[in-house]
C-alpha cells in the first residue's frame, strides 16, 4: 500500500480512484494530478514506482488536503457561529442553512423525529 498524505492508498485500484481516498481529492482533481505528474490514470497503485509516488506526493502537497482542510472547514463554521450571522445561527441550532423548508423534511439535519407531546384534556 502506498502511503500518501498520511493515507494508505488501496493497492488494487487504479491511481485516479486510489487518490480519491485522500480527503479533499475527488475524481477531477485526481485526474489533474495524474496529468501533471505524467502517470497514466489506468495504472494500478501497486505498479507505481518510488519516483512516481514521490511525484504524486510533491503534487498533492500543493493542495489543502486531509487534516488541514478539515481544520479550515471547522474554523470557517466556527467563525460563522461566532459572528452570529444567519448561517452561524442555523449551524448552532442544527438546521439547514440554505433556505430549505423545515416544517416537513430536513430530517438529515434535525435528526430522528421526537415523540410529540400530547395535550391533557
Swiss-Prot record:
Region (Disordered): 91-121
Single GO biological process annotation from the record: translation
Molecular functions (GO terms): rRNA binding; structural constituent of ribosome; tRNA binding
Cross-referenced InterPro entries: Rbsml_uS13_C, Ribosomal_uS13, Ribosomal_uS13-like_H2TH, Ribosomal_uS13_bac-type, Ribosomal_uS13_CS
Signal peptide: none
Any one cellular-component term (Gene Ontology): small ribosomal subunit
Top-level taxon: Bacteria
Residues annotated as transmembrane: none
Alphabetical UniProt keywords: Ribonucleoprotein, Ribosomal protein, RNA-binding, rRNA-binding, tRNA-binding
NCBIfam families associated with the record: uS13_bact
Similarity comment: Belongs to the universal ribosomal protein uS13 family.
Assembly mode: Part of the 30S ribosomal subunit. Forms a loose heterodimer with protein S19. Forms two bridges to the 50S subunit in the 70S ribosome.
Alphabetical list of PANTHER family matching this protein: 30S RIBOSOMAL PROTEIN S13/40S RIBOSOMAL PROTEIN S18, SMALL RIBOSOMAL SUBUNIT PROTEIN US13M
Role, per record: Located at the top of the head of the 30S subunit, it contacts several helices of the 16S rRNA. In the 70S ribosome it contacts the 23S rRNA (bridge B1a) and protein L5 of the 50S subunit (bridge B1b), connecting the 2 subunits; these bridges are implicated in subunit movement. Contacts the tRNAs in the A and P-sites.
Protein name: Small ribosomal subunit protein uS13
Gene (name only): rpsM
